[in-house]
Amino acid sequence: YKELRYNPLLVKINYTRYWLETLWLTNNNFDKYISKNMEVVNHDNIKKLKKQYPGLIFALPHMGNWEFAIPAGNNINLDLLAVAEPLSNNYVLNWFKKLRESLGIEIIIGGKGQNTFNTLEEKLISGKDICLLSDRSVNKSGVAVEFFSNIASFPRGPVALSIKTGVPIVPTAMI
């Protein structure tokens, strides 16, 4: 395999692209455009699972612009909810929260003292479909896992929520 090298310019280009895409999301045609140019793979399996469980747990990686999952979920009648990590700038946090909720996804702000796990359990049982970024732990409670020959910290939340509720985890990615 080809060894990947860190390229600061590419990081800046990708970050700029993310912000431009995020600003573009405020365009009213966003949902139609994304839906027209997106293919949801295995949506029949998701529909079968929805008949068996009130809500589902979708495990997503930090890959692409995950707001694009909103029209995909809308197309197959999912009632989406996601957890956002708190930001130090409340103005930016509230702007992102309002933007995402205007696109059709409920946002819960996680963090210390928020009782996020119990809230997610209640929402899941009541029929919400939960999108959780699952490729990195944002606090010290993650599980150490060997990942590409290195030790990485992954969040416990998706697995713990699945075990407690009996709801399956649906690995999800957008490419």
Per-region residue spans from a language model:
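Soluble catalytic domains of membrane acyltransferases
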Residues: T26-I175
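Negatively charged linear elements and acidic catalytic determinants
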Residues: Y1-M38
